Amino acid sequence: VDEICRSLSAILPQVDYIRVGSELSCDARFRKHLLENVLAECNNRREVNIRMADCRIYVGTVASIASKPELFKLKHFDVAIVDEATQILEPQLLGILCARFKDGRNGIGKFILIGDHKQLPAVVLQSNEQSEVHDEGLRRIGLYNLKDSLFERLYRFHLQEEHCRAVDMLCRQGRMHPGVASFPNREFYAGKLEALGLPHQLENVDAPVRFIPSERDTESVSGKTNRNEARIVAQLAADVYHLYKETFEVNRTLGVITPYRSQIALIRKEIQALGISALNEISVDTVERYQGSERDVI
């Protein structure tokens, strides 16, 4: 949500928006847009209604919006854009899908679900067998497994409809170098991904993807840490830092992704041992939490 707020704040002339959520989960730069802070300037209910009616963009997590059903009594929304929709299970969306405005209309006129079912699914602890749906009525509407998102269920319906125009694919991407995109493009997207042709995508890089083997950590009890890998990551971070020199930017140049939080701590410890202060500030995080972020080198 912070990423969306950052993008909205960068638009000129400035776009008015209200963020639904708590200060604890909101970047300090965007706290002035929080619903509570915006309405604190209102002196009476009439001013609250006017302020909320005048603001055309509301931003928040699914949980934050769903936890404020009173919002839909005061405001009718023409469109809701649900980002990362393939990571959201149907029950999590139900409150918003069923929201009603005070006159009985749907609280939201239209939904646009944006996501990629080829990437990270929703985090579910049950196995496929435990979450499988056996009820024939539910299976007839395409609900075969409770681990599936509404996005994926509707997408399957789209594949069955010959002339359905409810689904489209964004084929042009500006993040990955073609060499990085090659494997997922071939294996998951039927070769449909195209590079925008931005400067970083046109660079003549010998090997935009490198695989560096590492030895197993025999001292790791949980199997969720590997000191050998952490040392390799730290050394690579130092190499990138020295390569970029004065152009190295903490929030843009380098990021590290690893599956487990315990490995994050180990990697940070190895990086700190290098004695390069700038590297202590780089983002080291899990796959789930890195969604939506971007760096020159991962």
Descriptions of predicted regions:
Residues 1-15, 23, 49, 63-65, ...:
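Conserved helicase motor core of SF1/SF2 NTP-dependent helicases
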Residues 60:
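Short beta-strand and adjacent tight-turn residues that come in two discontinuous sequence segments
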Residues 2-57, 68:
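A substrate-engagement module of RecA-like helicase motors
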